[in-house]
């Protein structure tokens, strides 16, 4: 990337690529130096600032990964300042919430399963050009900011949108083309595979839809190569973190107390109350056995759930039977 300096001192690095006939420009190190990762994204005249931040320590007492994604649309991005009595901007619009979800969905599974540090991905729309949709830029910006940060992340991933105008595909369409075309398709991919598809369409042939998905996936590969280039030049080494995974020796001890066969017996009933009662009895049995071990007791419920999940998965995939006795191809 090009290095920009002021009075001989490093200011920021700039990377560019051609994407769907327009220039995608990424400035790294220009703003938000205190964030774990930040990218100032330019596409046409649309500008979005994407940042990725993570807490130093894992959050206590939770059994999920605390990721929050924010997409902020500001009135000044389209050159308007709210007038009158109320100068503040209201709560996030429906479009902003849906965009946050589309950013979250492909990225969440790429963080480590045992990571419990709070992570916030913030996308602020600074300026809007109706030819280049800011939503797409935020999706790419979040991926770049996270990839170059020191937050553990199994990326990169990239997102492409496709519209269909008069039977022709338009990659990364303008706002008008997006709203008026016959297809609104958003596809996120890693290098190996497609990881998310979001679509709305008038009726179009299945073959056309499949072609569009492949086309998005191909475009994503060029963007991923670009992100990898950025990461090689400015990426930080990933930080070590405290794993919140359930220890393997705990599972081994659980299998000694309640064998997989006994667990199968406990879940193999079509009475939900009965199944819950069986699991409660098993949990009590474990609680008694691990009474001395406070660390294990703290994660007992999650461990029992995972043991139950593995058992049901094995029953379905290997033995072709479901917990309520139905065959795998049988409908209620």
Tell where the protein language model's regions lie, with residue ranges.
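Conserved alpha/beta core surface patches that mediate binding of polyanionic ligands
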Residues: 57-67, 96-105, 165-185, 332
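Stable alpha-helical structural segments in soluble proteins, enriched in small hydrophobic residues
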Residues: 106, 137-149, 212, 219-220, ...
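Glycine-rich, flexible beta-strand/loop modules in the N-terminal catalytic cores of phosphate-handling
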Residues: 35-120, 125-127, 132, 198
